[in-house]
């Protein structure tokens, strides 16, 4: 009995010490830098919606955290730029100023508009070198006037010496050093200006790799270290078809591979419609089924014990034409997940 009491007292004492240590760490490194996995304290973090309700829910905090660096990476045509354009539209809805550093020189204004981006208000820069791109990014962050900054992409941030044609050994790892310097400068400023900074990145194959993951993101290790969120987006094999059996889009999985602000390793699945972006109606439909607000029996969709559509595309059309039901479902989903 005496041993049990001693053991219990020791546990209680250790818990108190742990709680005090967590508070000290949060004071030093900021809220969200350390937490218990089942803790809901991270709900207080300020966010900008990702534009995908499924991803907002998976992130656990309702969107991208303000004052943090985020990396979105994945294979070619997986939906990286689409995802960031949705975030831009959401930031603009909140009245924020948004900047897009287009190092790839590939931004499609018509597609951005179709997603909901106000291109008249979007600040755009198309620099011709990596150093210029990162200097412009740092200046915009320092100004404190930008709520969201997107850099597309890390792979296109080419150092000036490479552009000048100097292919010497001294240039090996130059991009990684350039990114490392930028991260050290930007990370401190971002937390003070409360800017959300999104770096889009690409995947490359490791040369001579025989074990483990053969894929690696470009730009060295600094971005991985400094970012608070890393999202891996990939297309699935599933295609989205309309009622005429024509392919109109793809499904993509977004995996949270790193999170300093919530529980990582969750996945969100989104429907990306060609020319339109993420299908919000499709998301509401899927989430409503998860919460049993809508039932599915085979190909039939049922709401309040009545079949209303056969097939997912018809169910989406029904919700599009019945906004009262759509709005009710969205409200219930937001209440459930507190977003």
UniProtKB/Swiss-Prot annotation:
GO terms for biological process: DNA recombination; DNA repair; SOS response. ATP binds at residues 74-81. GO terms for molecular function: ATP binding; ATP hydrolysis activity; ATP-dependent DNA damage sensor activity; damaged DNA binding; single-stranded DNA binding. It is found in: Cytoplasm. SUPFAM superfamilies: P-loop containing nucleoside triphosphate hydrolases (SSF52540), RecA protein, C-terminal domain (SSF54752). GO terms for cellular component: cytosol. Its main location: cytoplasm. Keywords: ATP-binding, Cytoplasm, DNA damage, DNA recombination, DNA repair, DNA-binding, Nucleotide-binding, SOS response. InterPro entries: AAA+_ATPase, DNA_recomb/repair_RecA, P-loop_NTPase, RecA-like_C, RecA-like_N, RecA_ATP-bd, RecA_C_sf, RecA_monomer-monomer_interface. Can catalyze the hydrolysis of ATP in the presence of single-stranded DNA, the ATP-dependent uptake of single-stranded DNA by duplex DNA, and the ATP-dependent hybridization of homologous single-stranded DNAs. It interacts with LexA causing its activation and leading to its autocatalytic cleavage. NCBIfam families: tigrfam_recA (TIGR02012). Belongs to the RecA family. This is Protein RecA. The gene is recA.
